[in-house]
Each structure stands twice: as structure tokens, then as C-alpha cells.
């Protein structure tokens, strides 16, 4: 780990001021970083993948509340920990898909530290990104992509480019994508802007090192959730081991039905894309069906119409089809509600 300066911000404006003043005098590789929980950033610093000359501590900023919005949704502070968010009674009752996604990730200790804003910004877990002696366009632009000719069975098959095939690792972000969350960002000029999560992440294309729409001096302050969705909420995650592992494939789902007919379907996927993935065309295919094998097969074929698979990754298409069939059939056996988590489920 390289030597760095540490400064604690007293307010959002103070944090942005420190950041913009420092960035104006530093090279890209030396830029300062905001740090909240630090559960991903500190690992990257230990491996010298990130080498900030300054850390700006924002963990004590007053961004740790969860409040109702006038529209009937929720406004979540960026400093709310993953554990706090998963344990919140409204999240458990009305946004159970989000609570389930949060509880499927990391360990209780990490969830206690990880912030909501930071979770959205965590970096890929591609093997080659974490190996400084391997080429990686995401870590070092124009150095090449070691994963394409190497081991990539856990990487993306949608939204990739010749430059990068890394997946986005966040479970929470998959649920946020399904819920159409909105990211509130304070800018260096003091203004705020709201960005739908569908527009927050950038595809790798020719610049895989640029992962979001954040600009110099931008700071995530809140995440807004729309009003709750009716239906059966679920989050299913297939991984190499039962705990503390990233998804090979994950599916966030909210499914509403009338007897044996699907009347509303929302789906978002993790482990298959360069960002949390949603395709509304497959939802339209399933709505009005009974979730039969033919409808599921057509939906999955539509989802993977532009997928880039090979002998290492083609299993993901089969895995998604089987998992989606299981999710739909399970939902049809449950009443139309948000499938709230019981108080006995630990965050």
C-alpha cells in the first residue's frame, strides 16, 4: 500500500471541495478517493491497484437516514450500511427483493461496514483485474484483456466489448435495477442531479475503466426507490459455494399472478452482464403466460440474443433458463405479496 494523506470531511460541500482541489493538481492514477466503509477500496489499495494520494473520509456525513418520499417510495442516505438497509422494517416488508439481495452478499461483518453508495461503486472481481502483472484494460487502459484468452467462466456474456468482459459484482445493484432506483448526485458546482440506475453504469466499449456517469467532484448522497411493487419478491443467487461468494448467475424477480397466469413480471440479472442487466422484452414475453417451459425458453432466448458465449461461459444460458423456470413456478405457488422477510432473518 502506498503512502496517502487522510482528511475527514465535515459536510458534503466540504468533501467535494477537498476532492476538486486535490484532483486539479494530480495525475489520474493519484486522484483522491472518497472512503465510506472501504470494504473494497482498501483491498484495492493493498494490492496497489488503486494508489490514491489522499483519502477523504465521508463516513460521518449526515447521509445515514431512510425516509419516506411524498410519492410513496423511500429516500436512502448513501452512508446507510448494507446491514441497516437490509434490517429496515419497510425494506423487509415492501422491498423484500432488495433485502434478500443484500443478505446474499458478503459476510455480516462486511455488511456492517459497507455503505449503500459504496456498494454501487464496487469494482469487478475479475481475476485479471486483481493481478497487476496481467494485462487489464479496466485497470490499465490499452494494456489488453487477459481474461479473453484466459479463465473467464465467471465473467460477462452480455454488454461486453473487445476491451473487457468483466462482470459487475454487486447483488444490491441488481435489485436496485429491478426497482428502477434513482441515484442522487451532488456536483462540484453545488447543484444536484438525479440519474436513473439504468443510466448510471456505462458499458465498457472502448473505455472499460470508466464505469459510471460520475464526474470530477460528484458525490452520491442518496438513492431513491419508487413506490413498492406488488407481487412475489425473490432474489436467487447461484455461486460456487454457499456463502461469501460472488454470483455466477443471479436473478432478482417481482412476479404478480392471477391463479396460474402471470399478470406482471419484473426481472433483473447479475453475473451475466458488464452491469446489472434488465431486458423488458423478456418480461413482456412472460406476462400473460403460465410460465410454461416454452415461454421460459423464448424469454431466455430473447435475453441472450446478443450474448457472446464460448465453451467456458455457455453454461450460464442453461443455468438462467433452469433458475428462471424455478423462480416462476415457485412464485405461482405463493400469494401476491412482497414476500416479506421474517424478523428471524438476520441482517
Give the predicted meaning of each segment.
Residues 1-347:
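C-terminal structural segment of proteins
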Amino acid at each position: 500500500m502506498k503512502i496517502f494523506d487522510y482528511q475527514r470531511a465535515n459536510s458534503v460541500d466540504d468533501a467535494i471541495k477537498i476532492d476538486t482541489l486535490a484532483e486539479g493538481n494530480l495525475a489520474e492514477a493519484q486522484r483522491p478517493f472518497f472512503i465510506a466503509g472501504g470494504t473494497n477500496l482498501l483491498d484495492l489499495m493493498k494490492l496497489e491497484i488503486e494508489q490514491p494520494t489522499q483519502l477523504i473520509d465521508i463516513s460521518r456525513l449526515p447521509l445515514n437516514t431512510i425516509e419516506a418520499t411524498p410519492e410513496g417510495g423511500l429516500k436512502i442516505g448513501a452512508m446507510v450500511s448494507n446491514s441497516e438497509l437490509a434490517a429496515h422494517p419497510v425494506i423487509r416488508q415492501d422491498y423484500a427483493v432488495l433485502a434478500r439481495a443484500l443478505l446474499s452478499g458478503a459476510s455480516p461483518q462486511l455488511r456492517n461496514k459497507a455503505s449503500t453508495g459504496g456498494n454501487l461503486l464496487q469494482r469487478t472481481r475479475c481475476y485479471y483485474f486483481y493481478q497487476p502483472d496481467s494485462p487489464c484494460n479496466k485497470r490499465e487502459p490499452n494494456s489488453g484483456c487477459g481474461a479473453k484468452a484466459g479463465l473467464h467462466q465467471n465473467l460477462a456474456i452480455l454488454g461486453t466489448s473487445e476491451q473487457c468482459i468483466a462482470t459487475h459484482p454487486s447483488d444490491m445493484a441488481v435489485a436496485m435495477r429491478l426497482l428502477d432506483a434513482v441515484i442522487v448526485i451532488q456536483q462540484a458546482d453545488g447543484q444536484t442531479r438525479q440519474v436513473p440506475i439504468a443510466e448510471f453504469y456505462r458499458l465498457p466499449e472502448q473505455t472499460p475503466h470508466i464505469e459510471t456517469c460520475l464526474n470530477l467532484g460528484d458525490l452520491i448522497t442518496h438513492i431513491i426507490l419508487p413506490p413498492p411493487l406488488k407481487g412475489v419478491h425473490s432474489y436467487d443467487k447461484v455461486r460456487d459455494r454457499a456463502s461469501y461468494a460472488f454470483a455466477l448467475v443471479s436473478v432478482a424477480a417481482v412476479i404478480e399472478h392471477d391463479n396460474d397466469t402471470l399478470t406482471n413480471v419484473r426481472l433483473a440479472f447479475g453475473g451475466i452482464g458488464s452491469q446489472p442487466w434488465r431486458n423488458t422484452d423478456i418480461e413482456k414475453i412472460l406476462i400473460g403466460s403460465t410460465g410454461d417451459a416454452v415461454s421460459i425458453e423464448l424469454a431466455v432466448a430473447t435475453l441472450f440474443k446478443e450474448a457472446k458465449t464460448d465453451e467456458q461461459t455457455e453454461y450460464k444460458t442453461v443455468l438462467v433458463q433452469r433458475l428462471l423456470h424455478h423462480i416462476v413456478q415457485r412464485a405461482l405457488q405463493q400469494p401476491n405479496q412482497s414476500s416479506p422477510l421474517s424478523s428471524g432473518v438476520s441482517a
